[in-house]
């Protein structure tokens, strides 16, 4: 083949295949819950795109799969799980928490209509999404409040909020730990709220952002742009009820205005977190205190936190400009 023919065919091939485009930045979230509202609003409001990022949101239910996705490099950022990230870090992974929008266990213990008192749960089946996850912690907090032992009930893994709600309404579960809007749906179906765990005022990193330290080091600029987009979403959530309710409806499939208003009140007002969504060290201390093993006893909250993105944005005056 002559050199001229070779270059002609090469140019034709390039023109036929078209330009190579970068893969979107994948961001995973761990639940179909209003707790994910900041991320959803940031995406739907176009704030990541405004920062020059092409982003794709992925729902990955359950902390284990989400952790594996981050460690494999498939998903650079995740929103939702805290305990699985801390447990993985205790085992030597380089996962790290870089922000957090919820500092309370925003869950309700919902029971069958005939169960009106916690004592009636003895010997009954109670659902959590994952053993060791935030719903499991919420259940333990409620049991402590009630003066009950875990051994007095049977704890069942459901895998997700929709599955837990379905199990409760079908009678396969006697009670289940649910977050909004699933707890609101349960109440509309005639279920009973045994405990509003959020009212127990337990400091807990309910909806943290996480990544790997290696990604953060290698992609500092991308990480900063991601955090700018995310915090713009948080500001929009807090200040634009109408838009936020539309976004919540899209992702949760809730359509009635009353439930959407409750959902917004919960996550856009009551539990939207601190002005700057730092990870609070005391919230990590709470998890470490309740985690068995020598590694947890010897660990410090700082081992799991990197607030440097938010600190850099704060120092630059970023948060003073939001909302202007």
Model-found features: residue ranges?
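Short, glycine-/small- and polar/acidic-enriched structural segments
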Residues: 23-170, 174-180, 193-197, 202-203
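Secondary-structure end/capping motifs
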Residues: 217-297
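Positively charged n-region of N-terminal signal peptides that target proteins for export
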Residues: 1-5
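Bacterial N-terminal signal peptides
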Residues: 6-17
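Short amphipathic alpha-helical segments at helix boundaries and their inter-helical linkers
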Residues: 75, 79, 169, 267-281, ...
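Hydrophobic alpha-helix position signal
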Residues: 42, 48, 88, 143, ...
């Amino acid at each position: 083949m002559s050199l001229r023919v070779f270059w002609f065919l090469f140019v034709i091939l390039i023109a036929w295949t078209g330009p190579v485009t970068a893969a979107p930045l994948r961001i995973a979230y761990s639940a179909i819950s209003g707790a994910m509202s900041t991320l959803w609003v940031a995406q739907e409001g176009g704030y990541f795109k405004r920062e020059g990022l092409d982003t794709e949101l992925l729902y990955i239910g359950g902390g284990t799969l989400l952790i594996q996705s981050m460690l494999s490099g498939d998903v650079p950022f995740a929103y939702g799980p805290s305990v699985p990230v801390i447990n993985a870090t205790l085992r030597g992974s380089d996962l790290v928490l870089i922000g957090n929008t919820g500092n309370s266990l925003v869950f309700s213990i919902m029971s069958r209509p005939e169960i009106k008192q916690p004592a009636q749960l003895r010997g009954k089946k109670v659902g959590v999404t994952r053993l060791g996850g935030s719903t499991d912690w919420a259940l333990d907090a409620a049991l402590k409040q009630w003066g009950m032992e875990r051994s007095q009930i049977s704890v069942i893994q459901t895998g997700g909020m929709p599955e837990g709600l379905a199990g409760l309404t079908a009678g396969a579960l006697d009670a289940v730990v649910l977050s909004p809007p699933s707890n609101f749906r349960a109440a509309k179906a005639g279920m009973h709220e045994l405990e509003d765990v959020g009212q127990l005022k337990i400091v807990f990193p309910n909806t943290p952002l996480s990544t790997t330290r290696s990604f953060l080091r290698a992609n500092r600029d991308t990480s900063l742009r991601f955090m700018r987009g995310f915090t713009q979403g948080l500001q929009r959530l807090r200040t634009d009820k109408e838009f936020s309710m539309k976004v919540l409806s899209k992702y949760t499939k809730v359509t009635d205005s009353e439930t959407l208003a409750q959902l917004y009140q919960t996550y856009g007002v009551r539990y939207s977190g601190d002005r700057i969504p730092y990870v609070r060290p005391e919230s990590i201390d709470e998890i470490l205190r309740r985690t068995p093993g020598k590694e947890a006893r010897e660990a410090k909250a700082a081992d799991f936190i990197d607030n440097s993105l938010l600190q850099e944005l704060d120092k630059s005056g970023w948060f003073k400009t939001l909302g202007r």
